[in-house]
Amino acid sequence: GEFRGGTKFRNGDTLLAKITPCLENGKTAFVNCLQEDEIGFGSTEFIVLRAKENIDERFLYYLSISPEFRKQAISLMEGTSGRKRVNENALKISDFLIPDFEEQKKIANILSAIDDKISLNNQINQELEAMAKTLYDYWFVQFDFPDQNGKPYKSSGGKMVYHPELKREIPEGWGVEKLEDLGTIVGGSTPTKSISDNFTKGGEGYSWITPNDLSNNKGNKFIKNGEIDVTVRGLKDASLKLYPEGTVLMSSRAPVGYLAIATKELTTNQGFKSFIPDKKYDKNYIYYTLQNCLKVIEQNASGSTFKEISATVLKDIKILQPNLEIVKKFEIKVSSINNYIRDNEVQNQELTQLRDWLLPMLINGQVKVE
């Protein structure tokens, strides 16, 4: 196609969002996905940073995500509230301390090694998650779970019967139930925001999750903390209850259907309908069943400004009732996969903290690379 206008970029460039709130939120990317000599085109709402002679491309990227650079860029924003942009000309003449080229490469090598490990863990987790999803689909959608002889049930001629409520054939002996049968469905609420003592940060309070936290957590399956915690006073103010580790969180509005599994005791705001695995199923089966039902859940959401699924409607959505022995076998198989995914996510959080701790000290020369 033909491109008219926009911003051009190539491999090795750094793309820096220049409009609020993307700049403040750290929206920056290093380009390494194009073919050789291929040119990319994009919006005019980002700045292309291209390394000059004696500037390492990767060092320039890490400089652009450093707190010092970010603070300077934010201070140069102009315009009306909500539509502010960085003054590019002012940014161009800003001064930053730059080490010699060899030091730049050493700094970039250290930080890149951390990011490469994070990327590898993410890739492994994507493949593991695809395996778990495929297993669920194979057993509970295609009905090729292992029969008594260890062969795929439906493909090997296992008896199927038509179920009028589900309007499809299911394995003999299986039935229908409702989403509320997966586990106890719970909601949440928000403490009075004008009372500052209701909230705290830095892990000093109780984890309080919002749909925005799940959005920021996208790509991860598990969640431990949100951006803000609530205090004991906050819990009482909003009559919040703490939900156990293993609770499956599902955002019920703005948007509907973000999922995560709690790795510690926590609570949520009112944007959730979460499932406590206190009945016959564990967190793994609940998670994949909800994931499989998301289209139906979204279709049952209502609202003009934004869609929301109510607890009353959600709990009555009909789902397949499987054989519990098959479910238990599935849960055992998937549990080991999910443990691996969780370990990788924890390692990535630790690596991210290490990178963010090292970054400013390496950039400003507080720490030297030998």
Kindly label every feature range from the protein language model.
Residues R10, G42, A113, T134, ...:
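Hydrophobic transmembrane-helix microenvironments that flank and shape a buried ionizable site
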Residues T268, K328-K329:
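Short small-residue beta-strand/loop micro-motif enriched in glycine and branched aliphatics
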Residues G219, D282-K283, N323-I326, I332-S335, ...:
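Hydrophobic/basic alpha-helical segments
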Residues G1-I98, D147-Y162, R168-P322:
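DNA target-recognition domains and sequence-specific DNA-contacting regions of bacterial/archaeal
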Residues L97-A108, S112-Y138, G157-T192, D316, ...:
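Non-catalytic DNA-recognition/assembly elements of restriction-modification systems
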Residues T134, Y138-K154:
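Alpha-helical scaffold segments that mediate packing/assembly in large oligomeric complexes
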